[in-house]
Amino acid sequence: MSGAVCPGSFDPVTLGHVDIFERAAAQFDEVVVAVLVNPNKKGMFTLDERMEMIAESCAHLPNLRVESGQGLVVDFVRARGYSAIVKGLRSSTDFEYELQMAQMNKHVAGVDTFFIASAPSYSFVSSSLAKEVATLGGDVSALLPDAVNVRLQAKLRG
């Protein structure tokens, strides 16, 4: 059985993320979305909120589950008996960074990284950009799953 991990902070999950998850789920028997904790970052959404939003947005994917983790991604991957990481790429800038990480993960732990090119319609979408635009009153409904947009708007209203 093949399995892969899609790691990230997902604060919040975007339609671009969901597209990558769907495509990974079509290639692997099992996919774990790893919502990672970075103690140096203060997110807009709590860990539990981020996990719930991903689970809601991906309920149509029976071979996908959501877990939290901290520390090295390769340790998270190997603890589950997997040997693959899936990362989405929006641009050549993403590729430069992710290639370096992929090579390190292979060197340190023998874990392979599979890159999935972002759909052109999502190549500009990021969680931070969606939050920034929403904070300034812009419409981000085309960037986020509906339930996530509702939560973001509620969070901004206080």
Curated annotation (Swiss-Prot):
EC number(s) per entry: 2.7.7.3
Record pathway: Cofactor biosynthesis; coenzyme A biosynthesis; CoA from (R)-pantothenate: step 4/5
Site (Transition state stabilizer): 17
Residues that, per the record, bind ATP: 9-10, 17, 88-90, 98, 122-128
Names of required cofactors: Mg(2+)
Catalytic reaction annotation: (R)-4'-phosphopantetheine + ATP + H(+) = 3'-dephospho-CoA + diphosphate
A single Gene Ontology CC term: cytoplasm
Keyword field contains Magnesium: yes
Entry keyword annotation includes Nucleotidyltransferase: yes
Family of the protein in this entry: Belongs to the bacterial CoaD family.
Protein name according to UniProt: Phosphopantetheine adenylyltransferase
UniProt source species: Mycobacterium sp. (strain KMS)
Lineage, highest ranks first: Bacteria, Bacillati, Actinomycetota, Actinomycetes, Mycobacteriales
